[in-house]
Curated annotation (Swiss-Prot):
Transmembrane segments: none annotated. One of its GO terms (cellular component) is chromosome. Keywords: Chromosome, Cytoplasm, DNA condensation, DNA-binding. It comes from Methanopyrus kandleri (strain AV19 / DSM 6324 / JCM 9639 / NBRC 100938). Coiled coil: none annotated. This is DNA/RNA-binding protein Alba 2. Binds double-stranded DNA tightly but without sequence specificity. Involved in DNA compaction. One of its GO terms (biological process) is chromosome condensation. GO terms for molecular function: double-stranded DNA binding; RNA binding. It is found in: Cytoplasm; Chromosome. Belongs to the histone-like Alba family.
């Protein structure tokens, strides 16, 4: 998947990310990957479900990857942050 088809979910409203996904699909992308860490994970799930249930019901969840990233703080400690990557795909015709 091309890097331009990846949307990093952060603190913006869900509608911003829904619009970004719709834009990617309208520009010809077959797949779009939503990537989030920490507190933004629930927002990424909300975006995927909003797209599937309200905007583009033909879109399918192709893959969900979960994991943990080790991040070093300014104090030198290491903390673990949960991650998720949700791949949405248009059905093949």
């Amino acid at each position: 998947m091309a890097e331009e088809n990846v949307i990093y979910v952060g603190n913006k409203p869900v509608t911003n990310y829904v619009l970004a996904v719709m834009t990617q699909f309208s520009e010809g992308a077959d797949e779009v990957k939503l990537v989030a860490r920490g507190r933004a994970i629930s927002r990424a799930v909300d975006v995927a479900e909003f797209i599937r249930n309200n905007v583009m019901p033909e879109v399918e969840v192709k893959d969900i990857e979960i994991g943990t990233e080790e991040i070093e703080t300014e104090e030198g400690d290491t903390i673990s942050v949960s991650t998720i990557a949700i791949t949405l795909a248009k059905p093949s015709e």
